[in-house]
Amino acid sequence: MGYQDDYVMRTISDLVRAIARLALGKNEINYALPDTEDKYSDTDRIYRKLRDLVDAGEINEAENQLYENLDENDTEHLEMAMTLYMYLNQLDDDTLFMANYSREEIVEGINSVSASFGITGFENFVDTTMV
């Protein structure tokens, strides 16, 4: 991974942290699942399904499912979505490429989900021409 890729990944992480501070009052964002499935909420089940799709290389399907299940009135869904995009950001470029996905799409997804929650103004935070 080159310096440019590392820079873009860090900038995406900074974008998510800025949204977390603004919308959730948190310095870091990390939607964590309970230890056992019997303790899962509906949101936990959605997140688990999304992660399973990503791990199977079905990133576009995971993103489609995210939008279908997103509740713009529940900030837990914002945290879940941002955590998912952070997870995608940690994937290497080859994995993203094999899934027909890109870092630019990560940025677009972050901005789109944020806009669903009324959070705007970050559209130019990441220079996607470097992606």
Language-model region placement:
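Short, well-ordered alpha-helical segments
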Residues: 77-81
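N-terminal alpha-helical interaction modules that lie
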Residues: 1-74, 90-131
